[in-house]
Structures are given as structure tokens and as C-alpha cells.
Amino acid sequence: MIELTKPRIVTMILVTTVASALIAGSATLTLIDWFWLMIGTALIAGSAGAANQVWECRIDRNMPRTANRPVPGGRMSYAVAVALTASSGIAGSIILWLGNGLVPACVGIATWLIYVLVYTPMKTRTAWNTTVGAIAGALPVFIGYTAAGGTLTELPGWMLFGVLACWQYPHFMAIAWLYRTQYAEAGFCMTTTVEPTGRHAAWQSILGSVALATCGVVLAWFPDGQWVASAASVLATVLILAASWPLLRASLNFRANPNDKTARKMLRWSLVVLPAVLLVMTLRASL
């Protein structure tokens, strides 16, 4: 059951939800608020991941990377997977609504709808699916942000959204390159299958890395939505740029030599850079 929910993605979403709540000002959250926030978010995220697997179960059988997932691998029936998807999604929405408010619940539902009903079918139709997936992947920051008292119109929330959305370009372009043959054979329309030289994937990774750092720097100088010129702003800027540089360098190396080795380095650095930047942003907001 846990494998059905894509636990690595759920973990990443929970980390970003915590960071966004801390940046918004988590003093308003009690321990029980945190509990409901984590449970509700995990259930909705898990439901979205499960729904994605249910939708793509036939295609997943054609990819070695995904053929052993619970449904395509025959370890879980289609009916059980659908039931778990529906029950966890509904439960998560209700928990967020009752435990943290209507806005966090609505953001969670919107995330689910975009990921499942827009992003998932787009994967076999257009390479623009990555952009839609980036939006769906970044929206959960507003679950934590609004649960902690922030609003959907505040600059810090949108800079967090920008960091998460832009980070997904180098991260998923690396994956798309490494599994480009499997994606093509399964019928997925990815940037690396549409443009197999890797040039487009590389430039999207480079621009995503630059935009990620830019959003982080903006938040360093506007920690509460207002311009704050201080030593903390300068220090946060330096740390964010330093933390972001390895991912940009890896993206540039991939652009110069698009191959599996440079793609793997880009993927590995993406897994290091995101938590590092989020940590700096969270610490800056607390000063």
C-alpha cells in the first residue's frame, strides 16, 4: 500500500509543507494543528500518487522502471487501488478542512485535480506536461503557508512556490534523459523524447536553476513581503547562491555534454540543493 502512494514524493511534499508553514509564521500552529497538517497533506499527496499509478497502470507495464509497481506488477488489484485512492483523498481533504481550515483543504484538492486530471493525461500528449507537473508539485507549499496564517496573495508564499516549481525542471529533465528510451517506448511525450539531443532539456534545467536561486534571493530581501536590508539578508543571499550553484553548474555541464553521467550528477545535486535552499529560506524568515 505504501509503495502505491509514491512515498518519496510524499516525503518531499511534507518537507516543503513544513518549510512553508515555518516561513509563514508557525507560532499560530499548535501541536495538534501540526499533526492534522501532516496527516492531511500526506493523505492527499499519497492519493494523487496512487491515482497517477492507477491511471497509468497499462503504460507502466511497458517500462522496466515502473513495471513492478503494485498495480502493473499484479501485487494489488485495480479495484483495491481505486478504493485506496478515493478513501485517502477524501480523508485527507476532510482532515485539512477540519484541522487547518478551508483554504489549505482547497489548495490540497486543487493540487490533486491538477496532478491527476491535467498532468497525468498530458504525459502522453505533450512535453508541456513537465510545466503542469511543476505547478502541481509546487502548490502544496500553500497548504502549509495558509495553514500557518499566510494568504494566497503574499510574496513569500509565491517565492516558495517559485523555488519548488523551478527546481522541478533540472530534477525531472535529468530523470527524463536517463529513462528517455523507456519513456519513448511506453508512449510518453517528454522533452527528451520530442527533442532527443538534450538541448531543450538542458536549457530548461539551466533556466530552472537560475530562477530557483532568484526566487530564494528575493525572499532573502523580502522575508515578510516588505523590503528588509540587513546583514541577515546579505548572508542569506550568499548562502542561497552558494547552495544553488552546484545545480546550475551540473545543468551547464549537461548542456555541454548531454549524457547519462552528467544527467545523474544533475539529478543528485537537485536532491541536495532543494533542502539546502529551503533551510536557508526558513532560517532567514525566523530572523
UniProtKB/Swiss-Prot annotation:
It is found in: Cell inner membrane. Belongs to the UbiA prenyltransferase family. Protoheme IX farnesyltransferase subfamily. This is Protoheme IX farnesyltransferase. It comes from the Bacteria. Signal peptide: none annotated. Gene3D superfamilies: UbiA prenyltransferase (1.10.357.140). The gene is ctaB. GO terms for cellular component: plasma membrane. It is a multi-pass membrane protein. Its EC number is 2.5.1.141. The chain crosses the membrane at residues 9-29, 31-51, 94-114, 132-152, 158-178, 202-222, 228-248, 267-287. One of its GO terms (molecular function) is protoheme IX farnesyltransferase activity. Pathway: Porphyrin-containing compound metabolism; heme O biosynthesis; heme O from protoheme: step 1/1. It comes from Rhodopirellula baltica (strain DSM 10527 / NCIMB 13988 / SH1). Keywords: Cell inner membrane, Cell membrane, Heme biosynthesis, Membrane, Transferase, Transmembrane, Transmembrane helix.
